[in-house]
Amino acid sequence: MDDALELGNYLPVSYKTRSEEEYVAFLWDAFQSNYAGEKYEFASLAFHLLYMSFVSFSIWQIKLVREQDFKNALVGFQIESETKLLDADTPFKFYEKLKESQIFRFLKLIGCTNDHVGEFSKFVKRRNKIAHPSGTVFFNDRITIDAEISDMMREVENIQRHMRPIIIEVYARFLLDSSDTEEREYAIPEQEVEANLIHRNYVSLRDIESCMTYDISKHATHIAFEGIRELHSCVKRQYGDE
């Protein structure tokens, strides 16, 4: 169970809509209640959806900062599907036009190999076996599901490592775009951080760990450096020590 709960640190700190927040909370409740009730098969399905949510949040961040590469990766899709993927206003809409196994292809944009993608997506095949009538219970004891969760968490950490340059770029863009207090959406730094860093980019605590390593001194000559420093301090104060 402890390994499973660690996934929470890889999921967004908070969500921009109540429906998204309630959806993720529902998945956690479904996982924990079924795990506690020893209904491990159903617990695994809920955890799989949490895992796929993590993947979709990562792809969302890639889409934001590698927009042209993301467009190039859509070659071969129908025009309608391509348009909907580009126009998606939430990561959850990716699955309206993508099969779960297809979404992993976008991780190649951050240097993941075909072998990596195969490891990341293998859980989809296992889930498909569980989600259809088979006459067999795959996860019938705690040892089996704990091993599966540990395997999934290894891949979560692997994806997170590959995502670090993307996260740093997300953060740098936020600091620069929001540095001018007269031009940004919210004058109050806490509100600006929540809306345009956390919510817009679906930022997690693990993402923030990477953000906290960012050296803002490289922007010391920027006309709005005080704004950059204020935002960086705000992020550190609110989330950096959690």
Where do the model's predicted regions map?
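Generic alpha-helical secondary structure signal
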Residues: 22, 26, 98, 122-125
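Short, solvent-exposed secondary-structure capping/transition elements
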Residues: 40-44, 55-67, 139-140, 165, ...
